[in-house]
């Protein structure tokens, strides 16, 4: 069966969950063909007291690949485990809670769900005066045990390591997309890349996205090569910048040496003529 946008979504999300000890799976399969669902699209089990989950990354992947206006994450406390589901719409039930900034922690009782939207993430960035560009500083979710089977959900933005994290995650995503494209190459209709290109544009590091001094071509470079080119370009830019600063500081010394050499040459010519 040809890979569709939902299979691509799972590949991209799992590439970002590689360090979280969990993986996402598709929910809706009907007549061996995945269709656009109205409820949960993907689900993944979360580890209590475990590594944080990149919530904003999952939301942006759903928004880009599925072309939906607002993506939602539903965090459900089953009493035995925590299940995170990606949804295209909010199916609010009695007792559910919607995350509203600026709250950084939410406590969930048994059989209750917490809804997190992509728009709420952007609102939280505005409140905390964080750059609102997608994935400029990724929002993560951590889950901790509480009393009486309660679960505490904590939201945090990691700013200091955002650029290295983006490079690592985007490289994993690009490799997953390349591998998927290679597997589907012999098939007549090929691999549907435009949504992935949108996600790649969203995940491009800030220095490359705002520089405007180069253009990348998807027809001549693979996405993995683009990520490597970005890192090489950043290193070269820093090296040339350091060289320029060194030459600027030594400009006056160069003029002094040039003047001395000219004086010595004039004295030598005068002595030779005499």
From Swiss-Prot:
Belongs to the herpesviridae NEC2 protein family. Its main location: host cell. Forms a heterohexameric complex with NEC1. Residues 1-252 are perinuclear space. Residues 274 are nuclear. Phosphorylated. It is found in: Host nucleus inner membrane. It is a single-pass membrane protein. Coiled coil: none annotated. The chain crosses the membrane at residues 253-273. It comes from the Viruses. InterPro entries: Herpesvirus_viron_egress-type (IPR007626). GO terms for cellular component: host cell nuclear inner membrane; membrane. Keywords: Host membrane, Host nucleus, Late protein, Membrane, Phosphoprotein, Transmembrane, Transmembrane helix. This is Nuclear egress protein 2. Plays an essential role in virion nuclear egress, the first step of virion release from infected cell. Within the host nucleus, NEC1 interacts with the newly formed capsid through the vertexes and directs it to the inner nuclear membrane by associating with NEC2. Induces the budding of the capsid at the inner nuclear membrane as well as its envelopment into the perinuclear space.
